[in-house]
Regions:
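A glycine- and small-aliphatic-rich helix-loop capping segment at beta-alpha/alpha-beta transitions
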Residues: 44-52, 77, 131-139
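C-terminal functional extensions of proteins
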Residues: 162-208
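Ligand-binding beta-strand-loop-alpha-helix segment within the catalytic cores
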Residues: 51-117
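Class I SAM-dependent methyltransferase SAM-binding "motif I" and its flanking Rossmann-like core
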Residues: 115-118, 122-160
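Glycine-rich beta-strand-to-loop/alpha-helix junction loops that act as flexible
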Residues: 31-37, 118-122, 173
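Short, conserved loop/helix-junction motifs that constitute active-site signature segments
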Residues: 48-55, 135, 160-166, 194-198
Length: 208
């Protein structure tokens, strides 16, 4: 795991945008994080008018009603603009177990992924893979998981699905993330270190 520190959050977001645009040029399938942190990157990507013929996956999804503004699909889709048409969403109209099985079969042909832009939580989670979660050791590609905040029920890509990805970038901004960055960079047994990729980076605005 390599860490690149930028002088400001804006500079780190610009770095993530450049990384993402470069990878979209050559990728057939990539993974995007939900949550607040990467949304400015997606909005900037939409403003660039980038055309991408491949498939985009969400790293995880919150178990809410389809179309709920709290879903990652809604928020990431709004930010991506026209590129939202490239998203392959989790099917929230099914049961969690049916959605897990459906998604697993759909993503299997795209393995290994070309890139993954992921987040990093204060306690070291990424996607909906939280420390101690049974999903970390799952032999499946997609799992039903439980998070600490509402909605607690989630669907998430597993380390098995994400391992083998060519390039993985964790975007972690703000002083609240500093300890998690340090722990991941030291190689502690946290979810980001369960993902085996050809190249892994953390982009941050924190000195570590």
């Amino acid at each position: 795991m390599r860490v690149k520190t930028f002088p400001s959050p804006q500079a780190a977001l610009a770095g993530a945008l450049a990384w993402l645009m470069e990878n979209l040029l050559y990728a057939s399938c990539g993974v995007l994080a939900g949550g607040e942190t990467p949304l400015p990157v997606y909005r900037a990507l939409a403003r660039q008018g980038v055309r991408y013929p491949g498939v985009l996956l969400l790293s995880d999804e919150r178990w809410l009603e389809p179309g709920d503004p709290g879903t990652n699909l809604y928020r990431v889709g709004q930010a991506l603009g026209p590129l939202r048409e490239r998203l392959l969403p989790f099917p929230l109209g099914l049961s969690p177990e049916q959605a897990r099985d459906w998604m697993e079969e759909r993503i299997r042909p795209f393995l290994p992924f070309d890139f993954a832009l992921l987040g990093l939580g204060e306690e070291g989670h990424t996607a909906s893979l939280f420390p101690g979660s049974p999903a970390l050791g799952s032999s499946r590609l997609v799992e039903v998981a439980v998070g600490p905040t509402y909605p607690s029920l989630r669907l998430t890509l597993t380390p098995k699905a994400l391992s083998g990805t060519r390039l993985v970038l964790f975007l972690a901004l703000g002083p609240a993330k500093r300890q998690a960055i340090l722990r991941v960079a030291r190689g502690e047994d946290l979810p980001p270190n369960r993902i085996r990729a050809e190249e892994k980076w953390i982009f941050t605005d924190q000195e570590v």
